[in-house]
Swiss-Prot record:
Function: Cleaves beta-linked terminal galactosyl residues from gangliosides, glycoproteins, and glycosaminoglycans.
EC number: 3.2.1.23
Gene that produces this protein: lacC
Positions annotated as glycosylated: N274, N389, N434, N600, N675, N718, N785
Name of this protein: Probable beta-galactosidase C
Keyword Glycoprotein: yes
SMART domains, per database record: BetaGal_dom2
Signal peptide location: 1-21
Cellular compartments annotated: Secreted
Positions with a binding annotation for substrate: Y80, N125, A126, E127, N185, Y249, Y351
Family: Belongs to the glycosyl hydrolase 35 family.
Disulfide feature: C255-C302
Amino acid sequence: MRLFALLPVLLGLISSHFVSATDNGKTTDVTWDKYSLSVKGERVYVFSGEFHYQRLPVPELWLDVFQKLRANGFNAISIYFFWSFHSASEDTFDFENGAHDVQRVFDYAKQAGLYVIARAGPYCNAETSAGGFALWASNGQMGSTRTSASSYYDRWYPWIQEIGKIIAANQITNGGPVILNQHENELQETIHSADNTVVKYMEQIKAAFSDAGIIVPSTHNEKGMRSMSWSTDYQDVGGAVNIYGLDSYPGGLSCTNPNSGFNLVRTYYQWFQNYSSSQPEYLPEFEGGWFSAWGGSFYDQCSTELSPEFADVYYKNNIGSRVTLHNIYMVMGATSWGQSAAPVVYTSYDYSAPMRETREIRDKLKQTKLIGLFTRVSSGLLQTQMEGNGTGYTSDASIYTWALRNPETHAGFYVLAHSTSSSRAVTTTSLNVNTSAGALTIPNIELAGRQSKIIVTDYQTGDGSSLLYSSAEVLTYATLDVDVIVFYLNIGQKGEFAFKDAPTHLTFKTYGNSKVSSAKSDHGTKYTYCQGDGTTVLKFSHGVLVYLLDKETAWNFFAVPTTSNPRVAPSEQILALGPYLVRTASVSGHTVSLVGDNANATSLEVYTGNSKVTQIKWNGKETPTKKTAYGSLIGSAPGAEHAKLSLPTLKSWKAQDTLPEINPDYDDSRWTVCNKTTSVNSVAPLTLPVLYSGDYGYHAGTKIYRGRFDGVTATGANITVQNGVAAGWAAWLNGVYVGGAIGDPDLAATSAELEFTSSTLRRKDNVLTVVMDYTGHDQANVKPNGSQNPRGILGATLLGGDFTSWRIQGNAGGEANIDPVRGPMNEGGLYGERLGWHLPGYKGSKTATSESPLDGVSGAAGRFYTTTFKLDLDSDLDVPIGLQLGASADAPAVVQIFMNGYQFGHYLPHIGPQTRFPFPPGVINNRGENTLAISLWALTEQGARLSQVDLVAYGAYRTGFNFNHDWSYLQPQWENNRGQYV
C-alpha cells in the first residue's frame, strides 16, 4: 500500500486534522481513510442496496429496479453472483443466455447512475440453494469447503476466473461501475495463524481475484459481532482485505408481536474503533428486512419490519455511529424461483424489504429515501469525529444523542432517538449544541415514538448559504439559480432554524399553510413554525428558497439527478414533488421533461432553477403548466386509477397424469441405474447401493426412485429421505400407496416404515416407487456437511428380503442444462416437467382430460394441468400480476406453478405460508398469450385439490418505463425431443 494526499493542501493552511488516503497499491481510483471512501479523488457516502439479479430473471427489469433505487436516494447496489446459476456442470459457464448475461447488470447500473459492489463468493449464503455453490459440486466432491483443500480449490477457482474477468472489465478503472470487490462471505477467522487453512483459503481467494484482473479494493463482511476477521488493523496474519465490514441484523422483530424487539445496537462505533480504526465504517449487510421460513408468517403480515419507522430509527442510528458505507440487505428481495431457494425459505424472497417483491415502492423505501437524499448532499458528514454520545445532550434523559463533528468545516450532526429505542412515547426536549456562534440550546424538539432526527449545525446548504442550526430535518438542498433547502417534520411538530452569517433585516414571504414567525436572538434571526399538512414554501429576500414538508409529503419529493454519475452535486438536480416515482428529468429549451410512474393522479411541482423553462412534459406528454410566485412550475401527472384491468378467468384446462411411474409396468429402462457402492460424499449412506441423487447427476427438484425385489415374503421397507426441510415424499408398491412423510418445516430428513400386504406383492419384479419433493440444498451452517449434505434416499432397507436394483430419474438431462435460458435449477423430475408440458407451445396429448386443479386428485396421485390465457393491458401500465391459490391445510400436497415455462411457485398448503405468487413482466406477457401450468400431487390417500386459482393484480401504475418488449427470447418454446426423458 501507499499513501497520497487526497485533497490539495494550500501552503500554510495544513490542518491538524488532515488525513492522507490509503490505496491498495493497484489503483488510486478508489481510496479510503478512517472517515470514508473516495472515488476518483472525491469523498462519497456509499448508500447501497442489495439486489440479486438471479431472483428477477428479466434483464430489462433490472433497469426498472435500478432507476427506482436511484430515484429513492441510492448511489450503489451490492450484488451476489451465484456460481449455481451460471454453472450447470463442471467446466461449463453461461454468461450469455437470458438473465445469465451479467454484462447487462453492469450496463444498467451504469446507465442508472449506481456504483456496484461485487460479491462473487465463491460461497454466498443468501438463502439460496447450497449458498450459491454450483449444485454439481455440492454432491460432496468439494471435500472440506471454505478451506485451502485442493479438492475445493480445484472446483471454485475456475468460477472466480470466469466471473472475475467480467467484474474486472467493469471496474471503475475501466469506465465501469464496480468500486469494491468482496472476498468470500461471512467467513469467520477464529484462529489467527498464517498456517491456518482458512487463512490460506482467503489468501487463495485474494490471488484468484488478482489473477482475474480485479484491482479495486477488497472487502469482507464479518458475521455479526461474533469474531474479528480479515482486518489489517487486527492480528493480520494473512487473508486480510482492504476494507473491513460488519454485517448486522439487530431488529429482533416478530411478525406476530409488533411490540417485540426494535432494540438499537449502539456499539458499532466502538467495534470499528477496536478492529478497523484506519478504515471507514462499513456495513456490507444491514437489516433491510428478514427472511421467512416454511410454516412461518408471510411477509405482508410483518408490520413492524415493514414500517417506515424501522428505516427512520435504525438507519439514522448508523449515521450517528459514523458509518459512511451503508448497504441495506435486502433493498429488494424478489423471488427464489425454480429450485433456487435454500430450505430455509419458500418461493417468495420478499424479505419485507423497502421494495416489494413485485417491484412496488413501499413506505419503508420512501422513508429510506429521506435518508439517502440527505447523505447525498451532506459532504460534511464524510469526515466526522465522534464528539460524544449519551443521554446528557438533551433536557430529557430519555433521549439518546450521537454528536458528530467535522473537524475542518465544523459542521455538527446530532442524531437523536429514544434511549429505549422501542419506546412509543412522544417526548419533547431541548438539545444543547456547539456551533460557530457558540453554545446554543435548540428548544421544542419532538420525537414521536420510534422516531429519530438528525439535527444539523454549521451546515452548508449551497454556494451562498449555511444553516447555523435547524431542528427541522434536512431532506436535501440544491444549488440552482438560488439555494433551495428542503426540510421535513411530522404534521404538528415544531421546527426552528437560523441561517449562518445571513444579511441583517432579512425578509421572507410564505406560500402555504404552515405559519412561520421570526424573532431576533443572540445569534441572529431564528425562524419557527409548526408543520402543517402538505407543502409550505418560504422565499427569503437574499434569494434562498425553503420548502417545509410534512413527512408523508416528503415521501413523494424527488431530487432527480441530471447526471449519470453516482456522485451527484447539489447543482446537478431537478426538484419534483407529487408523484409516486420520478425516474429521470431533463431540460431542453423551454421544457422540463420528466419520466415516472403514478398509481393515482397527482399534482406535479417542479423546480429547475431555470427561468426560461415554462412547460412540463410528463412521460412525453405536455401537461397544462403554470408558474408559481417563487419560481416553480405546477402541472399534473395522471394515474392508473381509471385503468381497465380485466384479468381473465382461468378455464379450458387440460389435465394429464404426472405420476405414471406409480404403475409397476412403467418402462424405466432409460433411467439411471443406482449401482454405486461408494459415494463422493463424506456423509456415509445408511444402506447400499448409494441412493444420493447428487452422485448420479440429479440435483434440483423432484426426484423419483424405483426399487425392485422378488418374492412375497417382504413385510415392508424402512426408507429415509433427505430433500430439505418441509419436503415430503410418498411411496407406492406395485401401484398401491404404502406411506411416506408429508414434510416437516423443522426436519430435513424423514423416515417411515412402509407396510406391505400380501395382496400388493408379486412373486417377481415388485416395484417400489418413491417420489420426493425438494426444497433446496442446505447452506454452510447446517450439520454435518453444510451445502454438501446429501439429497435423495439416505437409506432403504427391505424388511424380509433385499432389493435387487434401484433406478433414479430427475430433471430432464440432469446436468446437461437442456434449457439454458431458464437455467439448471428451473425444472425437477416430475413426468410433466421432463416432457416439457410446462413450456409455451406444448399442445397437450389427445388423451388429456378437461379437469382443472379445482377438481384435484383422488387418493395419492398426481396431475399436471395446463391452460393458456391472453392479456392486453395498456402499453403505458405497469401491473404486477400474480396467482392466488387456495387449498385445504388438512390435505397434504405439493403444488408447483409454471408461467411460460418458469417455475414461479412452490406451494405446500399444509405447511404454508405463501398462497399468492407474483410473476414479473417477461415471465408473464402483459400483452400477449401466456401458458400456465400447475402440477399437483397428493402426499396421502386423502387426495388433494385446489379451492382457488385466480389471477390477481397487486397494483397499477401509469408509467413512462418501457415494459413492452418482445419477451420471446426469455421464453423458449416446447420442442418435440422431450420423449427421451420418459
